[in-house]
Design a protein with these regions (language model features):
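Surface-exposed extracellular loop regions of Gram-negative outer-membrane beta-barrel proteins
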Residues: 22-29, 33, 156-170, 178-179, 275-279, 284, 336-338, 391-392, ...
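Gram-negative outer-membrane beta-barrel transporters
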Residues: 328, 531-694
Length: 797
């Protein structure tokens, strides 16, 4: 039920009423659990994802007039999970093998060059390779001959460019499992303290406050950098490395308010402050352009957000008809978003002399390369730090006023309406309204309906977030995934202006909903049904990744169009970007759905009963109307279709419409047997569609419109609780007791995929990324951690 007319931005689909603890006494819970699954630890079995959590709560009275103070603390430590398969692609090439032998003899081959075609040590490198290659015992005679006959580095590059993974793994005493990614939930340690307090000052006035502080330290992983990849400096990591992304997250919030009465009105004056900061540290990594001089840990920067709201609210009941409730008030909101840059080496690309690359890029003869001449990427591998051009400190404010009325026309008929006006400093005004009615048709049957308009202001993060990260795209020649530096440009950047991205404006909604509740008291049965329809215009999307304009594209134009493309090249180069994405008001959507909840309770005898809850929902969102394409010189002419496809690609459409289950249902049965209770819950998650393209019909080919579909699954949870006495309760249970996993990624890779609206073919992408993503990394019905077993002790005194 939309509530933007009452509460403002983000309440398009309603709000949640959170009741904070205010009880007295001491209570807590200690819980331990983990994923006991056949697929734990990369399908080795056992247990992973262990969680140990302690919750404590204490409440006491405050003053002598009914005040209270309640505080809650939580400490938790969660281990990571991983569900990666055994890597099945190339890991080592022949150069890696020769490099290993040379290293065993005290020679670091890769330290002898920065740029393989621009090094004074070419003869030395050639001689070392010819000296140590014969010691690689598994090279064939033909391979040894090719190496021995090579008289130049280019000839050696050709002679050493073949896969030796299986033999080299054996020589190094390793297995393919040693090169697995970590695919699953991250490691997490957290501590939280929150409070809720109220202090009556007199009979009509009370002071209240609530808030808290939390800290979370996360440890997740990026893609494994293999030793045969250009992003790996084998001088530092001879077997490649798995970058770790460490996060430090602080959240702080506090509210202070005063309630009283004035001229018959209940008055609430309050201020709320909330902050969040997210710092990144990248460990077990390297800046490949620094070679052996690279650190292994980087401060990659920080993002932070602050919001302060100040509210004055009035409400009063009037003796009109069967009762009129009038509420009105005002709000002032201030928001601030910051990005702090990381250390230089976390984002910079260096040349072979250790100088930072200019905005125009590194000259070919000065670029740092691997042995085969591939340019090495800059910045900390796994997560590139925020750059100086990413740094931002932006704020905005808004003023709002609202009125909300509810009139009981008769004892069985209520009508209500609300109107809210807001003025934002960055995009202007918005006015939203709501009408609703509730009819008590019979004592046990209620019908309601509502219609409302709403909005969602573009967040400061959507407007000003800027970052460059490593993403993987299919090589149009080899079909293999290769890293590209992708930049998110701000909405107000020069790059966005050149592409034609307009300034962000609010999303606007119109919605209607209706529903009924029906009770049969004699049968302890209640039924609730709700249906809804929401239309959202100007929905904010993240565009696909645009490629940097090539010199050929620039030279094919003239005049203003050519200058625009040159300026766009400069914008890319200033951020070391090869691809770029933008936030834009790009589409309109419609969402329709229905929710059904049926609750029943049956009492067998004193202390023995069963309560059953059946809930089901169907929800479908789809894009409607035309794309809101920017009109610029860049998207004109024959490239228009391709430009539109990049603006909102097929994968984004699937994410929007089919990436979450349309149908969900659950049946919970809670059997109470005196001090013992048993909970059995069955949940069904409907099918989902992966945005990746693959050969679904097994004809050997695929198109960008051909996607795998993962079928619906039934998940069963069970728990048994025992109330030992009034102070102690014990619970054991298992979520997903059947250890049910989603359907696996397709294992066959088609010959090619038609990857454009014109169905131009190119080599296909392996959706499993060499068997690392056994399950989809793009969609999730219910998670991929399998069975979770736990035990919990609850206590109160």
């Amino acid at each position: 039920d939309g509530s933007a007319a009452q509460y403002g931005s983000d309440a398009i689909a309603g709000v949640i009423n959170v009741n904070l603890k205010r009880n007295s006494g001491f209570s807590g819970a200690l819980q331990y659990g983990g994923n006991v699954s056949n697929a734990s630890n990369n399908f080795s079995g056992g247990i992973d994802g262990q969680l140990l959590q302690l919750d404590l709560n204490y409440g006491t009275s405050l003053g002598k007039k009914g005040g209270f103070f309640n505080i809650t603390g939580t400490l938790a430590n969660r281990e990571n999970t991983s569900r990666a398969g055994i890597r099945n692609n190339s890991i080592f090439n022949a150069y890696n093998a020769v490099e290993r032998i040379a290293g065993n003899n005290g020679v670091n081959l890769s330290s002898l060059f920065g740029n393989i075609t621009n090094t004074p040590n070419q003869s030395q490198i050639i001689n070392y390779i010819k000296q140590y290659a014969p010691q690689v015992g598994y090279f064939t005679t033909a391979q040894q001959t090719a190496i021995a006959n090579a008289s130049s580095l280019s000839a050696l590059q050709s002679a050493l460019n073949f896969d030796v993974t299986n033999n080299e793994l054996s020589a190094r005493g390793l297995s393919r499992k040693d090169f697995n990614m970590n695919v699953g939930q991250s490691k997490l340690a957290t501590g939280q303290v929150y409070y809720n307090a109220k202090l009556p000052l007199n009979e009509i006035t009370s002071l209240y406050s609530f808030g808290g502080l939390s800290y979370r330290k996360g440890d997740s992983y990026a893609f494994y950098r293999l030793p045969n990849g250009s992003g790996t400096s084998t001088s530092l990591y001879s077997n490649g490395f798995l970058p770790e992304i460490e996060s430090d997250i602080y959240d702080f919030s506090t509210a202070l308010g005063l309630t009283s009465k004035l001229a018959g009105f209940d008055v609430d004056l309050s201020t709320n402050l909330g902050t969040n900061s997210f710092s990144y540290t990248i460990n077990n990594t390297a800046n490949a352009t620094l070679g052996v001089n690279s650190p292994s840990s980087f401060n990659a920067g920080k993002i932070a957000f602050l919001q302060n709201t100040n509210n004055l609210d009035f409400s009063r009941n009037f003796d009109v008809l069967e009762g009129l409730n009038l509420a009105f008030g005002a709000e002032y909101r201030y928001e601030n978003f910051k990005i702090n840059k990381g250390e230089e080496a976390s984002y910079a690309i260096y040349d072979i002399n250790g100088n930072i690359a200019p905005a125009t890029g590194v000259a070919t003869n000065l670029a740092v390369t691997d042995f085969f001449g591939n340019r090495r990427g800059g910045g900390s591998q796994g997560f590139t730090g925020f750059q100086p051009l990413d740094e931002i400190n932006k704020s905005r404010n808004s003023f709002a006023g609202y009125v909300d009325t509810e009139l009981n026309i008769f004892n069985n008929w209520i009508v209500s309406g609300a109107l809210r006006y807001e003025n934002y400093s960055d995009f202007g005004n918005t006015l939203n309204g709501k009408l609703a009615t509730l009819v008590k048709v019979t004592p046990n049957f209620n019908w309601r309906a509502s219609a409302q308009t709403g909005f969602r202001a573009p967040s400061l993060q959507q407007k000003y977030f800027s970052s460059t990260s490593t993403q993987f795209f299919t090589n149009s020649t080899t079909g293999l995934l290769e890293p590209k530096q992708v930049t998110f440009f701000t909405n107000e950047s020069r790059a966005a202006e050149l592409v034609g991205i307009p300034r962000l404006k609010p999303e606007k909604s119109k919605s209607i909903s209706t529903g009924f509740t029906f009770k049969i008291p004699s049968a302890n049965l209640s039924i609730a049904v709700d249906g809804y329809f929401t239309r959202i215009n100007d929905r904010v999307i993240l565009t696909g990744a645009y490629a940097r304009p090539t010199d050929a594209q620039v030279n094919a134009t003239s005049g203003a169009a050519q200058q625009a493309l040159k300026d766009l090249q400069s914008a890319f180069d200033s951020k070391y970007a090869e691809r770029a994405s933008f936030f834009s008001n790009g589409i309109n959507t419609e969402t329709k759905g229905i929710d059904v909840v049926i609750t029943h309770k049956h009492n067998f005898s004193e202390g023995i009963s069963i309560k059953s809850d059946l809930a089901g929902s169907y929800n479908h969102t789809q894009r409607v109307g035309k794309l809101q394409l920017p009109q610029t010189l860049i998207n004109s002419g024959s490239n228009a279709a391709s430009y539109a496809f990049t603006f909102f690609p097929e994968s984004s459409k699937v994410y929007l419409e089919n990436a979450i289950p349309r149908f969900k249902a659950s049946l919970s049965n809670n059997l109470s047997l005196g001090k013992l209770d048993i909970l059995l819950r069955n949940s069904y998650f409907g099918k989902v569609t992966d945005p990746g393209a693959t050969d679904v019909n097994l004809d050997g080919f695929s198109s960008v419109y051909e996607h795998p579909v993962y079928g619906g699954k039934l998940i069963t949870d069970i728990s048994i609780g025992y109330q030992y006495n009034k102070n102690l309760r014990f619970t054991v249970g298992a979520n997903n007791v059947g250890d049910v996993y989603p359907d696996t990624n397709p294992t066959t890779v088609p010959a090619f995929t038609n990857t454009s609206p014109g169905l131009t073919s190119s080599p296909s992408t392996d959706l499993s990324n060499a068997n690392q993503f056994v399950y989809s990394r793009a969609v999730s019905q219910y998670g991929l951690n399998g069975r979770y077993v736990f035990a919990r002790i609850n206590f109160n005194f």
